[in-house]
Amino acid sequence: MLRNWMIKRFKQPEINEIKVKHEAIIKHLLNMIPGCKVKHKHNFDTGSVAFYMGISGITKELTISDQYLQDYTAIEIFDFIKQKEVIKIISTHGKVRISMREGYPAINYR
């Protein structure tokens, strides 16, 4: 029977990989939107990470599902953001969500 400390140790590399992706996404957003401030928060209820971008006193939200973060590399995530013009969508809409639908990434916004 595995003890709690053993389970935590086995899961550690996956957690570190996700944290690295979070930091890479923050740096990417800072490069794409000059002058913005980015904070992130993990929502365990919805299984996603919300990146809050402060742009000229207005807060915009980019939410990315945990499943999408686990299934794709940071470079693939950046390519998807560029290909789907997520930054333009964020500028016109307040909230954008990237999630998995039927095995493929999808964008929802409002």
Identify the residue ranges that each predicted region occupies.
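Negatively charged, low-complexity tracts enriched in Asp/Glu with abundant Ser/Thr
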Residues: 2-40, 72-97, 109
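Amphipathic, interaction-prone secondary-structure segments
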Residues: 30-67
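Polar/charged, Gly/Pro-rich intrinsically disordered segments
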Residues: 58, 95-110
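Surface-exposed beta-strand edges and their flanking turn/coil or helix-capping segments
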Residues: 53, 66, 75-79, 95, ...
